[in-house]
Amino acid sequence: MGNNYGFGRIVLTIVFAMGLKIAPLSAIFAVYNPDWVLLVLIYWSLAVPERVGIFHAWTFGLLTDVLTGRLLGQYALAYSLVIYICLMLHKRLRQLPFIQQALFIFFCLLLSQLLLFFIKNIQQTAELKPTFWLPVFVGTVCWPLVYTVLRFVRLAKPIKTD
């Protein structure tokens, strides 16, 4: 139960993030909705890189594609690329001050958002609106909250049921 219990927490947090991603929001708030799934995947890939990798990013990316009704593989490609970069730099990133980590998160979210835009632009002509950047900024601002909550989840001791 020891190894699977920790992975269960990881999957649960990612599934919760998927719920936040597809939660119905009014048009006003929908443009501010950051990519919760990517934020959670980034956290877990930095915190426990031996448990969360490119395969998990690809898998949850495909699930996100299905849940959002986007072209199959869009999120899978974006998440895999970002998590690959995180895994390559995770030892350095863990040593950085929080502000610099947030700057890295900004660039990860920006890379994902741009990749999704370019894929959408190949599929159909897409217009780059100013609201396109809002989820990147909101996600960067939400990073301290995501980090704190997921760190608490990771370090919480399991409840014994005897």
Where are these regions (language model features)?
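Terminal, non-globular segments
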Residues: 1-162
